[in-house]
Design a protein with these regions (language model features):
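Short glycine/proline-enriched turns and hinge-like loops at secondary-structure junctions
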Residues: 69-71, 133-136, 159-163, 177-180, ...
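Hydrophobic, small-residue-rich alpha-helical packing segments that form membrane-like cores
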Residues: 132-133, 148
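A short core secondary-structure module
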Residues: 151-196
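N-terminal glycine-rich flavin-associated loop
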Residues: 88-106, 135
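Alpha-helical interface subdomain recognition
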Residues: 1-89, 105-107, 114-118, 143-148, ...
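Flexible, small-/acidic-enriched active-site or ligand-binding loops
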Residues: 136-138, 189-220
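A short, charged helix-loop
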Residues: 212-237
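A short, Trp-centered hydrophobic/proline-enriched beta-strand micro-motif
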Residues: 118-126, 169
Length: 388
């Protein structure tokens, strides 16, 4: 069941498939049994190969040394990387196109381009204890003679334990744009940054999601992205892309789950015949394939719309449709596959058990399923079905 891809996109897909299958998947169980950790030399190899394959440069313009990959090519890559558990595919950072619109040359050289080469690692500090999908930011950026003073607490700062700088969203406390948002680069060693605690989550990742408190942290004006008030616009750009790539990863996870369930059901003997001969098992497999096929079509169609330069408001809704459907379908598929595998599906050494835990958060982060439904409904009511 393949989406027709042109030669360039197929080349990206095949490269990612080999990387996932040959380099990452063989290390999943060791990572699972060691709190997500792998030997340093293995992690270094994964990072080096990912960069050599161009994955860290996909969304970077050619003039900055990037690959300028189309969105459909990026979706093809992340679908294959989504077949891997334990977030082992998070072995590289990738700058996003909106950064090259927002950042000064100095910021690009200091913060953004080193992500592509692997010399630096970022983390996003957006969510707060009293805000999530609605991005009701309480962290403030108050004007100071030498820049801004940042104060507030950020939750779920993904990969902060591996990062050396934050991309933080704050509400402007004063000035002509008071009440609007801005984004800031903040080096991790800035005075006033406090690690509050590191919660333990259901998945087994080496990348943690800690809580940080920013205590009157001084940030120079030169580290603000874009102009005052642009923060939400750039966050929307990030959310659109991330939601689409989550959909792609969910499609990859669902594909692997179905393959494993099919292989198991075909060889597991029950009452003298393969489990796959049972019609209830066949129904579960059929439902899973149907949902996967629908999720892939939705996701690749949204990628095509991106590449064709369609209206941003329409794209925002389409990415929400893709994330909503693909993430919820992948969760249903994981549940069925655990059921098909029986007790084996509840063993951490099997991918089905790991996906069962890991996929759950895809219905929460980067906008909950409920928020995606609101975005979709509002787009429908404003622009009609043909305008979406």
């Amino acid at each position: 069941m393949r989406i027709p891809l042109d030669q360039a996109a197929e080349s990206w897909r095949a490269r990612a498939a080999r990387f996932a299958t040959e380099e990452l998947i063989p290390w999943e169980v060791e990572a699972e049994l060691n709190e997500g950790r792998l030997p340093p030399e293995v992690k270094a190899r994964h990072k080096r190969l990912a960069i050599e394959h161009g994955f860290s440069a996909m969304d970077v313009p050619v003039e900055y040394g990037g690959r300028n990959a189309r969105v459909v090519e990026q979706v093809a890559v992340w679908e294959q990387l989504g077949r891997v558990t334990n977030a082992l595919c998070w072995c590289f950072s990738e700058p996003h196109r909106w950064m090259f619109e927002a950042c000064t040359d100095e910021q690009l050289q200091r913060f953004v381009l080193p992500l592509m080469s692997g010399k630096r690692k970022e983390c996003y500090a957006i969510t707060e204890s009293g805000s999530g999908s609605d991005v009701a930011i309480e962290t403030t950026a108050r004007r100071a003679p030498d820049g801004y003073r940042i104060s507030g607490e950020k939750w779920y700062v993904t990969s902060a334990n591996h990062a050396d700088f934050f991309i933080l969203q704050a509400r402007l406390a004063d000035g002509p744009h008071a009440g609007s948002h801005a984004l800031f680069f903040i080096d991790g060693d800035q005075p006033g940054i406090e690690l509050v605690r590191t919660p333990v989550f259901s998945h087994t990742f080496s990348d943690h999601h800690p809580i940080y408190r920013f205590n009157d942290v001084l940030v120079p004006e030169s580290q603000r992205l874009g102009t005052e008030g642009d923060g939400m616009q750039y966050s929307h750009s990030w959310f659109r892309r991330e939601r689409l790539m989550i959909a792609a990863r969910c499609c990859g996870a669902a594909s692997r789950l179905i393959e494993e369930a099919t292989a198991f059901a075909s060889t597991r003997m029950v009452g003298g015949e393969p489990l796959s001969e049972r019609q209830m098992i066949q129904a579960m497999l059929a439902d899973s394939v149907t949902e996967l096929w629908a999720a892939r079509l939705i996701t690749y169609e949204a990628a095509r719309a991106h590449d064709d330069g369609e209206d941003l408001r329409s794209l925002h809704a389409r990415c929400s449709v893709a994330k909503l459907y693909a993430s919820e379908a992948a969760n249903r598929i994981a549940d069925r596959v655990v059921q098909i595998l029986g007790g084996r599906g509840y063993m951490r050494e099997n991918a089905a058990e790991r996906f069962f835990r890991e996929l759950r958060v895809d219905r929460i982060w980067e906008g909950t399923s409920e928020i995606q439904r609101l975005i979709i409904a509002r787009a429908l009511l404003k622009r009609g079905l043909e305008g979406m």
